[in-house]
């Protein structure tokens, strides 16, 4: 179960499964393992790091594992 609290933070509660949160430029995606569903939503309440064109070798995907 997930919800956004009064301060604008994303609270995630997971029982009995491995849970993965994926942050992609401008969007937030998360799925369960095994993947039963995938949800993507705009990152309006999260800061997004701006990648420079002079840094093409840097990964533009950040993976956060719970």
UniProtKB/Swiss-Prot annotation:
Its main location: virion. One of its GO terms (cellular component) is virion component. It is found in: Virion. The keyword GTP-binding does not apply. It comes from the Viruses. Induction: Expressed in the late phase of the viral replicative cycle. The keyword Ribonucleoprotein does not apply. Glycans are attached at residue 11. Disulfide bonds: none annotated. Belongs to the asfivirus I177L family. This is Protein I177L.
């Amino acid at each position: 179960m997930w919800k956004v609290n009064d301060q604008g933070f994303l609270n995630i509660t997971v029982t009995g499964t491995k849970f993965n949160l994926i942050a992609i430029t401008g969007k937030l995606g998360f799925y369960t393992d095994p993947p039963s569903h995938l949800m993507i939503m705009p990152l309006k309440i999260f800061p997004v790091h701006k990648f420079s064109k002079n840094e093409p070798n840097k990964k533009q995907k950040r993976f956060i594992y719970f």
